[in-house]
């Protein structure tokens, strides 16, 4: 074995260090060292010839890997292997900073399971009856938030394990957007001077603009929670407060969320510096909330209205609204603010039902106005000219009225959403999310929605601490139990629609309660109060007007309009009456 190794080494010097010969040399040297170690360990006391061979091997030792390959290598990989394979003890982190193999395997298996659910569309049977990829990604983002960040009942830093899991998992889900591109024309110059127009790929404009902004908002919210590591306030479970209080049964009423923790402040209240910091953090969170709501409203507005939603609409606006709302919207003295003041909006169901009715009436009126105009154009040209003018004038007047009514309903819906920013998604929004096929828009909508929920929760928690500080300073020497009872009482009044302080206007959000048939993913249902909230949203974008970020309704699409084909004098008259 010794001679073979020396011959091999000299041969490698003679014929050059090619890759194949180097690999063969390394294998032969490794085998020779292994065989020599095994033979020396099996024999007891070696002979003189054995000692001389060992001495010769020590003099002419084989070259190291670093000498052969030309770069430094670790010493651990060149050591002689013993006869018995030593089982490595699993360590959490080795000397090189790598995690143990078991942890990597579990993470890989988790990613495999998540990608399998996305590809199968949440249909584990594999029969192809799952949801579309857009809805599957939206469901995955929503469920990930609910599992990791959905229970923010305290102002405290997020555990490092949850933080790493959130960032790793959300990056995996958002990585799909890296492959969503759009083709743009560009010119390519050749050496001979010719210029040819080619199509280049670039990231889609909405993802390129909004997704980095959402990532930045995500990091800001996590940094806000990390800033509450050392605070002057603390939290106490309501069960402990009830056991210590002599009036333990005074607040145990139906609907009281006794399982939620209550904030506590010192008897003399928070310091001025802490108070200013909380006020600044509240305003900063408010701006983040507005940005998330704006991106979410734009993403929803750009989604197409499902045909199933349009087919389920009633035939006229009175059937959608009811007699009371219909009379107020169609009256000459219409005022959205006065109408909202005259309606009982003390319950969440009443507000959601009103929003659904008003939103449906918008589409009914606009669809009827457009359909009447097309019917008048599709009639035969053999009709007398006078009848054509009369019908066109009559339908033009009816269409203008319906368009005015639709604009009034839209303004009423905007005022309603501004008054209740935590309003749950309407039937149209839910239908858009369910039937949306655009993966990019689905990512923007779901990511902005969960960040909006997180910002809202942080704002509510800050308001709770500030409210407890106000109570402690007003009461002076009042005990903590009375402060806790007041906070519970005002929280219950806020949930039932009471009015008063800022804490009443922001009730704890209940994020996920609506689900679709065929999928297990819930959707946002933020709670609200009937009073005007402190978080006023950005101006909402109408899904009908077009404008910036808006889309045309399906019944206004160009493929359904035949007037482009030309109707002679009838088309000229229609264009004149429009202008």
Curated annotation (Swiss-Prot):
Stored InterPro entries: PRONE_dom, RopGEF
Gene3D superfamilies according to UniProt: PRONE domain, subdomain 1
Spans annotated as Disordered: 31-89
Superkingdom, natural source: Eukaryota
Family annotation (PROSITE patterns): PRONE
Limits of the PRONE domain: 98-479
Sequence ranges of Low complexity compositional bias: 31-61
Keywords: Guanine-nucleotide releasing factor
One MF term in the entry's GO annotations: guanyl-nucleotide exchange factor activity
One Pfam short name: PRONE
Role: Guanine-nucleotide exchange factor (GEF) that acts as an activator of Rop (Rho of plants) GTPases by promoting the exchange of GDP for GTP.
Free-text note on domains in this protein's UniProt record: The PRONE (plant-specific Rop nucleotide exchanger) domain is responsible for the GEF activity.
Protein name according to UniProt: Rop guanine nucleotide exchange factor 6
UniProt organism field: Arabidopsis thaliana (Mouse-ear cress)
Taxonomic path: Eukaryota, Viridiplantae, Streptophyta, Embryophyta, Tracheophyta
């Amino acid at each position: 074995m010794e001679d073979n190794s020396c011959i091999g080494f000299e041969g490698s010097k003679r014929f050059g260090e090619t890759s194949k010969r180097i690999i063969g040399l390394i294998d032969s040297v490794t085998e020779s060292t292994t065989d020599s170690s095994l033979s020396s360990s099996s024999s007891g006391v070696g002979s003189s010839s054995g000692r001389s061979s060992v001495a010769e091997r020590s003099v002419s030792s084989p070259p190291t890997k670093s000498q052969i390959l030309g770069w430094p290598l670790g010493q651990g990989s060149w050591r002689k292997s013993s006869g018995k394979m030593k089982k490595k003890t699993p360590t959490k982190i080795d000397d090189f900073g790598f995690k143990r193999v078991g942890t990597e395997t579990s993470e890989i298996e988790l990613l495999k399971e998540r990608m399998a659910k996305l590809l199968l569309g949440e249909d584990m049977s594999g029969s192809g009856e799952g949801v579309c990829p857009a809805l599957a990604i939206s469901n995955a983002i929503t469920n990930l938030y609910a599992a990791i960040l959905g229970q923010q009942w305290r102002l405290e830093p997020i555990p490092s394990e949850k933080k790493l899991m959130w960032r790793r998992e959300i990056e995996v889900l958002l990585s799909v957007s890296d492959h969503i591109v759009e083709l743009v024309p560009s010119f390519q110059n050749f050496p001979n001077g010719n210029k040819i127009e080619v199509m280049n790929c670039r990231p889609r404009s909405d993802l390129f603009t909004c997704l980095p902004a959402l990532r930045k908002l995500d990091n800001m919210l996590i940094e806000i929670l990390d800033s509450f590591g050392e605070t002057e306030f603390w939290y106490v479970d309501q069960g402990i407060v009830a056991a210590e209080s002599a009036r333990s049964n005074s607040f145990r009423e139906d609907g009281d969320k006794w399982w939620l923790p209550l904030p506590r402040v010192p008897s003399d209240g928070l310091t001025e510096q802490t108070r200013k910091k909380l006020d600044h953090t509240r305003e900063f969170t408010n701006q983040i909330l507005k940005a998330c709501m704006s991106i979410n409203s734009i993403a929803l507005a750009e989604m197409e209205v499902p045909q199933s939603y349009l087919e389920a609409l009633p035939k006229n606006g009175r059937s959608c609204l009811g007699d009371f709302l219909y009379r107020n919207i169609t009256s000459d003295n219409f005022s959205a603010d006065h109408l909202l003041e005259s309606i009982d909006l003390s319950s969440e169901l009443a507000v959601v039902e009103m929003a659904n009715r008003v939103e449906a009436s918008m589409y009914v009126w606009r669809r009827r106005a457009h359909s009447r105009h097309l019917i008048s154009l599709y009639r035969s040209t053999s009709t007398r000219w006078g009848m054509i003018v009369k019908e066109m004038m009559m339908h033009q007047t009816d269409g203008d009225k319906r368009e005015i009514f639709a604009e009034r309903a839209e303004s009423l819906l905007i005022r309603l959403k501004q008054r209740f920013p935590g309003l749950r998604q309407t039937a149209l929004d839910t239908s858009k999310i369910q039937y949306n096929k655009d993966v990019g828009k689905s990512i923007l909508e779901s990511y902005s929605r969960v960040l909006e929920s997180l910002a809202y929760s942080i704002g509510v928690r800050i308001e709770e601490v500030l409210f407890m500080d106000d109570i402690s300073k007003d009461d002076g020497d009042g005990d903590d139990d009375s402060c806790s009872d007041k906070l519970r009482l005002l929280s219950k009044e806020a949930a039932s629609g009471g009015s008063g302080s800022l804490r009443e206007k922001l009730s704890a959000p209940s994020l996920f309660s609506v689900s679709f048939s065929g999928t297990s993913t819930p959707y946002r249902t933020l709670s609200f109060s009937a009073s005007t909230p402190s978080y006023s949203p950005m101006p909402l974008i109408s899904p009908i007007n077009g404008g910036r970020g808006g889309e045309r309704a399906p019944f206004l699409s160009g493929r359904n309009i035949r007037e482009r084909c030309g109707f002679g004098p009838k088309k000229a008259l229609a264009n004149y009456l429009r202008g």
